[in-house]
Design a protein with these regions (language model features):
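Short, flexible loop/turn elements at secondary-structure junctions
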Residues: 68-70, 138, 150-153, 279-282
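Short, flexible hinge/linker loops that cap or flank conserved catalytic cores
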Residues: 57-58, 137, 213
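Short, flexible boundary segments at extreme N-termini or domain junctions of P-loop NTPases and their
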Residues: 1-71
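Conserved GTP-binding G-domain of TRAFAC-class P-loop NTPases and closely related GTPase folds
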Residues: 3, 170-172, 176-308
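Extracellular structured ligand-interaction cores
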Residues: 61-63, 131, 218, 272
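Switch II of P-loop NTPase G domains
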Residues: 126-136, 140-177, 189-199, 203
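Conserved G1/Walker A P-loop phosphate-binding module
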Residues: 40-124, 141
Length: 308
């Protein structure tokens, strides 16, 4: 693909020397069931997501929305980013005001957040950290907040035309600036997204999202599980041009809504978004059938953080 230059304020990684970030949990998370007692939602809300109630108390900092289908790796991305940011001096903690004070499920999730982030059996944490707002601080000053919520509320492969629940529309329309991190992955790493028609419908859902976004919002495509592709030639040595082309080939017209229509800037910026690749780490199956997590190289979360 010639002269592909996504952009959203920072220099876009069209060459092999720029940023990347992705993940490698493959098929693992498609097998994990979700317990309404531990994932931050009540049984009623699990049955009807339009009943979900949220509060974004801090309107002064951006919301980083992790947007993608089930099993695409959003939760492990949050876990990996939390570990990385804490290792370089940031404070990362759940926002307890995000859910009603009467919600004991969410309170329990907040109480156990540190344990779930730090445990070796990180794959098990994806069963629990399913709906949460996490704030990032530097020396006591809030920087941003990450929103993690179930992928099926963004795009459900078995019901691809489902409307967004009310709470997602509330987030789209609230006054915070948003950074939308849109997840893609190799065609073979998620059985729920393995056929081209489903991926095309996901592209359509992203197009619908784009039509609702404010001009203040930014978009980052996160090509996850990059270690499952042939485009990695070593840490930091990513063939970005081929990685971008692979996303275009696998997700029909996914970039089309972000075409730069400005007659001047489109000459050097074909699209208006950023593109990163990511890998959380490695997952090893143990003798008891569970998966242990080994943290990946800091290159990937570092580059994603630079783009945020």
């Amino acid at each position: 693909m010639a002269d592909f230059e996504p952009n959203s304020g920072a220099a876009a990684p069209a060459q092999n020397t720029k940023p990347a970030s992705i993940q490698s949990q493959s098929h693992i998370f498609g097998k994990i069931s979700t317990s309404p007692e531990t994932n931050g939602l009540s049984g009623e809300e699990m049955r009807d997501p339009n009943k979900i109630k949220i509060t974004i108390a801090d309107t002064s900092i951006p919301i980083v929305v992790l947007f993608g289908p089930p099993s695409c790796g959003k939760t492990m991305t949050l876990i990996r980013m939390t570990r990385f940011l804490r290792s370089v001096g940031y404070t990362v903690e759940p926002d307890r005001s995000f859910r009603p004070s009467t919600d004991g499920h969410y309170e329990n999730l907040c109480d156990n957040f540190d344990n779930m982030v730090s445990q070796i059996e990180a794959a098990d944490s994806t069963d629990k950290i399913n709906f949460m707002l996490v704030k990032v601080f530097k020396e006591g000053k809030p920087i941003c907040q990450f929103l993690e919520s179930p992928g099926e509320y963004y795009f459900k492969p078995s019901d691809p035309y489902a409307q967004f629940p009310f709470y997602i529309n509330d987030i789209i329309n609230n006054k915070n600036r948003k950074i939308w991190v849109l997840f893609t992955e190799p065609s073979h790493t998620n059985r729920l997204m393995s056929d081209s028609q489903t991926r095309g419908l996901y592209s359509q859902k992203i197009s619908k999202l784009k039509s609702k976004l404010s001009s203040r919002d930014r978009v980052i495509f996160l090509n996850n599980k990059i270690d499952e592709t042939p485009f990695v030639n070593g840490i930091g040595k990513i063939n970005y041009r081929q990685a971008i082309k692979d996303v275009q080939n696998n997700y029909d017209n996914i970039f089309a809504p972000f075409k730069n229509l400005n007659p001047i800037t489109k000459l050097w910026q074909e699209y208006r978004f950023d593109f990163v690749v990511f890998q959380s780490g490695d997952f090893v199956k143990t003798e008891d059938g569970s998966y242990s997590f080994s943290v990946g190289n800091d290159y990937y979360p570092k580059k994603l953080w630079e783009f945020l």
